[in-house]
Design a protein with these regions (language model features):
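A detector for short, charged/polar N-terminal pre-domain segments
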Residues: 2-15
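Short, charged beta-turn/beta-strand-edge "cap" motif at the junction between a beta-strand
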Residues: 66-71
Length: 72
């Protein structure tokens, strides 16, 4: 599976997992992140993650179900 690239702005050193879920359309609102993460498996660099505030940096790989994303 080829990960979809998520590009950070130059003034943005990271994004949170909750923001990633929202901008990719996996959830509709930021408030849904907590519930989504409690009920679904999300991997960050191959390890399970359930914190919506997890900071994602350049080079991180995220897998949500059959979807994959890379932070660039």
């Amino acid at each position: 599976m080829v990960p979809k690239s998520i590009k950070l702005r130059k003034d943005e050193p990271f994004i949170t997992l909750g923001v990633l879920l929202k901008i990719t359309g996996i959830i509709d609102t930021g408030g849904q992140a907590k519930f989504f993460l409690a009920e679904n498996t999300v991997l960050v660099n191959g390890e399970g993650e359930n914190r919506r505030g997890r900071k994602l940096y350049h080079g991180d790989l995220i897998q949500v179900g059959k979807q994959a994303f890379s932070i660039d």
